[in-house]
């Protein structure tokens, strides 16, 4: 069984004026990222949207000292970017589509991702997303 982990493809990481944007480089992959995500969903494979989430006044989170505010809960910056947003809205009620709020670089840190993958007997994990030196790497 296989799964796709879609990591941090949000306005703050991709939009031209996003807080920590990859800008044009992130925007270039939109069509391919959306297409592969749709293919995984429609094939019945497990698709996880692992999305960075921060609180504006979280003085204890180490990222607040490293980076400007980004992916803040309740802001446009945290919304999925471009045509990935309507794709998620179209399929979000399917049992093979799962959303994880992550507070750390790793989608495994402080989440139930490991158990979700194990209970589905996932053997092949595919990664897509932006900020590959941080968000995808970890």
Please give the residue ranges for each predicted region.
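Short, well-ordered secondary-structure micro-motifs
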Residues: 59-61, 110-112, 138
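Internal catalytic-core helix/loop-beta-alpha segment
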Residues: 75-130
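Active-site acidic carboxylates
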Residues: 1-97
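Short glycine/serine/threonine-rich phosphate/pyrophosphate-binding segments
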Residues: 132-138
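Cofactor-binding loop segments of dinucleotide-utilizing enzymes, especially the Rossmann-like FAD-
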Residues: 52, 130-132
């Amino acid at each position: 069984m296989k799964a796709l982990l879609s990591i941090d493809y949000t306005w703050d990481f991709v939009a031209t004026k996003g807080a920590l944007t990859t800008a044009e480089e992130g925007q270039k992959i939109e069509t391919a990222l959306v297409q592969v995500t749709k293919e995984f969903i429609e094939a019945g494979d497990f698709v996880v949207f692992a999305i960075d989430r921060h609180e504006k006044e979280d003085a204890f989170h180490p990222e607040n000292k490293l980076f400007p505010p980004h992916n803040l809960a309740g802001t446009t910056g945290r919304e999925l970017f471009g045509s990935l947003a309507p794709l998620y809205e179209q399929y979000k009620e399917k049992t093979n589509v799962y959303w994880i709020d992550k507070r750390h670089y790793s989608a495994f840190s402080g989440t139930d991702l490991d158990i979700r993958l194990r209970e589905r007997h996932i053997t092949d994990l595919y990664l897509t997303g932006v900020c590959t030196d941080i968000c995808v790497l970890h």
